[in-house]
Amino acid sequence: MNALAATNRNFKLAARLLGLDSKLELSLLIPFREIKVECTIPKDDGTLASFVGFRVQHDNARGPMKGGIRYHPEVDPDEVNALAQLMTWKTAVANIPYGGAKGGIGCSPSDLSISELERLTRVFTQKIHDLIGIHTDVPAPDMGTNPQTMAWILDEYSKFHGYSPAVVTGKPVDLGGSLGRDAATGRGALFATEALLNEHGKSVAGQRFVIQGFGNVGSWAAKLIHEQGGKVVAVSDITGAIKNEKGIDIESLFKHVKETRGVKGFHDAHPIDANSILVEDCDVLIPAALGGVINKDNHKLKIKAKYIIEAANHPTDPEADEILSKKGVTILPDIYANSGGVTVSYFEWVQNIQGFMWDEKKVNDELKTYMTRGFKDVKDMCKTHNCDLRMGAFTLGVNRVARATVLRGWEA
C-alpha cells in the first residue's frame, strides 16, 4: 500500500470514529490546490535541464498551509499529496495554527552543483511565488533541502513581494532562522519518547535504542538519547549499519560521520546488514529515514522492539501496523512523534512576524510543553474512542480540522 492509500485509509477510519458526514469527509480529503510546474535551468556545462516541481496545498481551515519542500528523484504527485495531507493532521495534533502542504522537485541533489541547485530553486520559486506567502503557505526544508535552500527561496520571493523572512522557516539563523530549529525534530522525538515511556513507568535511561537513519533527525535523536542515559546499540544510514551491544559512543560517531560522511567504518562498533537494522534486539526502535520501511516482511523477520517511535514520515505499512499492534508493540505515530520540527518552525514564524528572537532555552522549553501536551491530547482521544495511539492521533487531528471547517461554514 503506497503512502497516499495508507494516509487516506487512516483518515477514513478516523472520520468513521468521529461520525463525520460524507460531504464533510470528502471536503477534508480533497486538496485545496495541486500545483505542477516545469523548471528548466542552464547547467554549468551550458546544456539545458528540465525538472518537474510539485506543491500540494491540502487544507487551510486552521491557518496558513505549512510543509516542506523535498528534492529527490522519486518525488511524485501521490507522495506529495500524502505528505501534504499528513501535515494537515500533524499541525492540528500539535495544535499550532496551520494547515498542511508539501512540495518537491524530482531531482537528485548529489548530481547537481551548488550553482545548479540555486538556479533550480530560484526558478521553482518564480513559478510558485504568487501561491505561497506569510499568511498563505509557508515552506520549510525536507529531504534533500536545507537552510541554504530556504535562503534562496526567501531571496527570490522577496524580489517580488519585498523582504519577507516569515515566508519560509528552517532558514539560517543569520536570516531570521530560529535557534534550536536544526535539532527540533530529533528533540521532539525525544520528548515524545519520554512521554510514552513515562506512561509505562519507564525512563529513557537504561533503555536500548536502535535508530534507522543518521541524518538530521536520527543523529540528533541519538545524541539527545545518549545524553539522557539511553543506550544506542545500533544505527544505520545510506553507507551501512553498525552495532555495539554495550552502547555506541555517539560523540565519537558524530566525529567519524563528519570526517567520512557516513557511519560505515566506525571503529567502536561492528558492521551489520543494513537490511536487518529494524529487527535488531532493542527496547525502542526509531525509524528516522524513508517511509514504508516497516512492512509485513519485517514482521516475518520478527521485530523485537517493544516501542516504535515514528521519527520518519509514514514508516509503517498498515498491514505491519496491525500485526505489530496485535503482538503488543506500542507504536507512537508520525503525526505526533515527529511534529517537533513543524512546531519549532511555527516558533520561527512567530519570531519573524514579531521581530523578536527567542533564546534557545525558551525554544526548547516551549517545544517540551507542546510535545507533552500533545501526548496527553492523543491519549485522551484514545480513551474517548477506545483506539490505539495512531487512531488517537488521527481522530485528534481530523476532529480539530473538521471543527474549524464547520465553524468557517465550508462544509456545505
Curated annotation (Swiss-Prot):
Pfam families in alphabetical order: ELFV_dehydrog, ELFV_dehydrog_N
SUPFAM superfamilies with a match to the protein in the record: Aminoacid dehydrogenase-like, N-terminal domain, NAD(P)-binding Rossmann-fold domains
Main enzyme class: oxidoreductase
UniProt-annotated location(s): Mitochondrion matrix
Gene Ontology MF terms: glutamate dehydrogenase (NAD+) activity; glutamate dehydrogenase (NADP+) activity
Tissue: In roots, stems, leaves and flowers but not in fruits.
Entry keyword set: Mitochondrion, NAD, Oxidoreductase
EC number(s) recorded for this UniProt protein: 1.4.1.3
Main location: mitochondrion
Record-annotated active site: 102
Single GO biological process annotation from the record: glutamate catabolic process
Alphabetical list of InterPro entries matching this protein: Aminoacid_DH-like_N_sf (IPR046346), Glu/Leu/Phe/Val/Trp_DH (IPR006095), Glu/Leu/Phe/Val/Trp_DH_C (IPR006096), Glu/Leu/Phe/Val/Trp_DH_dimer (IPR006097), Glu/Leu/Phe/Val_DH_AS (IPR033524), Glu_DH (IPR014362), NAD(P)-bd_dom_sf (IPR036291), NAD_bind_Glu_DH (IPR033922)
GO CC list: mitochondrial matrix; mitochondrion
Swiss-Prot/TrEMBL catalytic activity: L-glutamate + NAD(+) + H2O = 2-oxoglutarate + NH4(+) + NADH + H(+); L-glutamate + NADP(+) + H2O = 2-oxoglutarate + NH4(+) + NADPH + H(+)
Record-stated family: Belongs to the Glu/Leu/Phe/Val dehydrogenases family.
Protein name: Glutamate dehydrogenase
Gene transcribed to yield this protein: GDH1
